[in-house]
Design a protein with these regions (language model features):
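Patatin-like phospholipase
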Residues: 1-176
Length: 176
């Protein structure tokens, strides 16, 4: 039996939490929280706590998947090989605005680029060890893209990437 784990970031603690999406998320509340970017969307309340996108505290939750019992991972990244995240002006501004009410969340935002970059290196090491298969685009993707045609084109690109690597994906799965 498989699992459906939903990663969220607790606004009060700034830490990631992982909820059971099959039993704990019947109303898709946690799933909605995974889309709630601080300041862009309101927080989502679950059991009296406020939550945001899990990617704030744990952008690529590969380590959690391994500690949860997954031996091998297929990782879908949204940026090309060699990409390194930087701390941008908008993130600094968001962190400053959140710092009074949610100091731990503010800190997580300010450290997110460092965490992301470490996690990419960790995933690449897993790939070298044969414990992960990384799928990623050849060119950067904009996480906040709104243009429908661009989104469709991005979807088609991802689909084509998977099709072109299907034999490799099947071989990786067969080794499990």
């Amino acid at each position: 039996k498989g699992k459906f784990v939903v990663g969220v970031t607790n606004a009060r603690t700034g830490k990631s939490e992982y909820l059971d999406g099959l039993t704990d998320d019947r109303k898709f509340t946690a799933s909605r929280a995974t889309c709630a970017m601080p300041l862009l969307f309101p927080s989502i309340r679950i059991n009296g706590e406020k939550y945001y996108d899990g990617g704030v505290a744990d952008p690529i939750p590969a380590q959690h998947a391994l500690s949860d019992g997954c031996g091998r991972l297929i990782l879908v990244l949204t940026q090309p090989k060699g990409y390194r995240k930087r701390l941008g002006k908008q993130t600094k501004a968001a962190a400053r605005l959140l710092s009074v009410k949610y100091p731990a969340l503010s800190k997580a935002l300010l450290e997110r680029h460092l965490v992301y970059n470490r996690q990419v290196l960790f995933c690449e090491e897993l790939e070298k060890q044969g414990r992960a298969l990384i799928l990623r685009p050849e060119s950067p993707l904009d996480s906040f893209e709104k243009d429908i045609e661009t989104l469709r084109q991005t979807y088609r690109m991802g689909h084509a990437l998977c099709e072109s690597r299907m034999d490799e994906i099947k071989a990786f799965i067969a080794q499990a």
